[in-house]
Amino acid sequence: MILSDDDILARLETQELVVEPIDDLDMQIQPASIDLRLGEEFLEFQRTNISCIHPNRKEEVSEYVSETIVSEGDEFILHPGDFVLGTTKERVEIPSDLLATVEGRSSLGRLAVVIHATAGVVDPGYCGQITLELSNLGTAPVALTPGMRVSQLVFTELTQPSARPYGAARDSKYQNQTGPQASRIGEDPEFDQTDDTAQHNKENTT
């Protein structure tokens, strides 16, 4: 069951669901979602002389991105073909019986601005700001202003609370994140850190 506006308001009032700060409840609550605003921090992807990015090598990932902070009232220009990581202004706490999904606002979509590439799911139990995967699919630069409404959060009620909500156990590497976070896929259990380090050292000595 997808929560309606009244359902969302009731959850917010009892603090079963946390979305904060909300400066204008009437403007941000939609018929079956809540609008989230753009934060001030961005991670931009740089051109690099690395032949390819190995997702499990933190130093390569960190070399690939740089942080930009845009004060509220100023603009971040998203150029055609650009892909950057942004963040929501709001911090959320999703209860264990809800699944949230991030959707782009239609008005931005009509300007060819996409809010997420693949990561549209916010797991039950997640706490923190939400990283946005922003891209411009159009032919003209688009000015984005921190504080503007850029996405919608839709809530689906589970048939029963999750037995292992995000943050309770395994693989919760983005729990309580603030600001946009670059990929930490290298922390996934399928990557053997010992083997990777040995291979990396071997490459550096050849």
Curated annotation (Swiss-Prot):
Gene Ontology biological-process annotations: dUMP biosynthetic process; dUTP biosynthetic process; nucleobase-containing small molecule interconversion
EC number assigned by the record = 3.5.4.13
Tell me, what is one Gene Ontology molecular-function annotation carried by this entry?
dCTP deaminase activity
Locate the active site. Answer: 133 (proton donor/acceptor)
HAMAP family for this protein: dCTP_deaminase
Q: What does this protein do?
A: Catalyzes the deamination of dCTP to dUTP.
Q: How does it assemble?
A: Homotrimer.
Instruction: Tell me what this protein is called.
Output: dCTP deaminase
The source organism is Haloquadratum walsbyi (strain DSM 16790 / HBSQ001)
